[in-house]
Amino acid sequence: MERIMVALDGSDHSEKALHLASDIAAKSGAELVLLHVMSDKPLTDAERHMAEVEYLDELASSLDATGIDSGGDPQTRAQRMLQHYADVAHRFRELIGQRLMSQSRARARGRGVRSVQIVLEDGDPAGTILRLAKGLHVDMLFLGSRGLGDAKGLLMGSVSYKVAHLAECICVSVK
């Protein structure tokens, strides 16, 4: 076994997946790839609250909140405001991803993993996980059986369900 990937979203189940994947990587000497996929969907209420409570200073310093011109055509102003909102949402998710990856790398190294690669990607979680697992020639893939998704995920099919059924490598869904 040369390469193990763990998909992380900050949920308790993905944290357990990290521990298990780290233990196996440490014992086998495999490289551990930590993956976090950033959604391009609008922020959830929970994410907006987290942004206000935990990340407000970092967001304020990285974005120019006064960058939206209040003059001109209302439609153009509205488009600029929507783009600004999308930029703020993306930057917030980037900050979450960077913090999650930094903490996860430290945990993996603390469990004896020597080689850790971090990957932050935008896009559809299931599709991105599958594409990268194949492209990076991953031997084993770990992910939480239940992530931070909403109730819609129960109806549409969860990321772990899709990945488990379509992955070309060993796939471990951790509960």
Q: What residue spans do the PLM features occupy?
A:
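Absolute protein N-terminus
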Residues: 1-2, 175
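Small/aliphatic-rich secondary-structure junction motif
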Residues: 2-83, 111
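Short, conserved glycine- and acidic-residue-centered signature motifs
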Residues: 14, 93, 97, 156-160
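Gly/Ser-rich helix-loop-strand patches that form or flank binding pockets
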Residues: 23, 126-175
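A structural micro-motif
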Residues: 30, 114-116, 169
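A structural preference for short, hydrophobic beta-strand core positions in alpha/beta folds
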Residues: 34, 117-120, 173
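Structural beta-alpha unit
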Residues: 74-141
